[in-house]
UniProtKB/Swiss-Prot annotation:
Domain named EF-hand: residues: 63-98
Example of a GO MF term: calcium ion binding
Family matches, as Pfam families: EF_EFCAB10_C
PANTHER family: EF-HAND CALCIUM-BINDING DOMAIN-CONTAINING PROTEIN 10
InterPro entries according to UniProt: DD_EFCAB10 (IPR049760), EF-hand-dom_pair (IPR011992), EF_EFCAB10_C (IPR056587), EF_hand_dom (IPR002048), EFC10 (IPR039879)
Domain of life: Eukaryota
Identification of the protein by name: EF-hand calcium-binding domain-containing protein 10
Biological classification of the source: Eukaryota, Metazoa, Chordata, Craniata, Vertebrata
Signal peptide: none
Length: 127
C-alpha cells in the first residue's frame, strides 16, 4: 500500500510542476538543434525558462511560425490544406506539447493550418 501511495504522490508532484512537459520540451529542442555541447545547451534552456518565469517575459521557443508551417506542410503531403486528427496529435507529441495520457477530443473535423498554428503557439506559451 505504501508503494502505491508514494507512486501517487510522485505522479501528483510531476503533474503539479509540469515536469513531463518540460522534459519533453527539452528533449525535443535537443533533437531539433543537436548542439555540439548538449549539457551546456540544456542548462542554458533551463536558465532561459527560469528567467522567463521570473520576469513574465515570453520564452523564445524553437518553433517559430515558419517551422510550424513547414511541419504542417510535411504532414499535408496532398496539399489539401488539412491534416488528420491523428497527425495533429502525433505532431503535438513530437513537439513535446502533449503527453501520452492527455485525452484530446477529436471533433471529426480536419485540422487546418490556422488551427494547428493556434494550438501549437498556445501550448508553447503554457510550458
Amino acid at each position: 500500500m505504501e508503494t502505491s501511495s508514494r507512486e501517487l504522490q510522485a505522479a501528483e508532484y510531476l503533474e503539479k510542476h509540469q515536469i513531463k512537459e518540460v522534459v519533453s520540451y527539452l528533449t525535443s529542442a535537443l533533437l531539433f538543434f543537436r548542439p555540439e555541447k548538449p549539457k551546456e545547451y540544456l542548462i542554458s534552456l533551463l536558465e532561459r525558462l527560469r528567467i522567463a518565469k521570473v520576469t513574465g517575459v515570453a520564452f523564445p521557443f524553437f518553433m517559430d511560425n515558419s517551422n510550424i508551417v513547414a511541419m504542417f506542410e510535411m504532414m499535408d503531403s496532398s496539399g489539401r490544406g488539412t491534416i488528420s486528427f491523428v497527425q495533429y496529435k502525433e505532431a503535438l507529441k513530437t513537439l513535446g506539447l502533449c503527453t501520452e495520457d492527455e485525452d484530446l477530443q477529436d471533433d471529426g473535423h480536419k485540422i487546418t493550418l490556422d488551427k494547428f498554428k493556434e494550438e501549437v503557439n498556445k501550448r508553447m506559451k503554457e510550458i
